[in-house]
Amino acid sequence: MRRIIFTMVLTLCFFDASSQKIDIQLSSHTFPNDSISFSIYNTDSLDVLFNVQLEKKEKGEKYVLYTEDVFSHAYGKSIVLCLKPSGHSTFKFKLRSQVLFYMRKHKVQSKMTNNLNKKGEFRFKVYCGFNYNEMNTVVYSDRFIIL
């Protein structure tokens, strides 16, 4: 009986549908602000849809959302990309430059923008899945520093 249960548990673990579908590899662990690059590899036999977000480390071990999507400007619309089976893509992007607003009505936006543009420790958060409505698998990259 124990052998049967053990075999069933191993089989379920082997056929786990929520296993990691992609692998993220950084070109470095330290980047200047104008040349952040990384590669994403599809480790599955099916097309994988994915969206990349950037998180910044705050005080302690907590990470907060820095951008909704690294492929468009900060706080912009999300872009979902497709990666073919056993394929990979290399991406390079630049963070938004610091913006200074001197008009009173833009004071709140300026304060928020300047706060977000501080250098620090970051990581990529990648949502992926086999279709657009079920991108529920989350994969994190190694942490890296932006100088």
Regions picked out by a protein language model, each given a short descriptive name:
Residues 39-44:
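Asparagine-centered strand-capping/turn motif at beta-strand->loop junctions
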Residues 133-147:
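Short Trp-Ser/Thr-centered turn/loop motifs at beta-strand boundaries
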Residues 45-88:
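The feature marks short-to-medium sequence segments in extracytoplasmic or secretory-pathway proteins
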Residues 4-15:
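Sec-dependent N-terminal signal peptides
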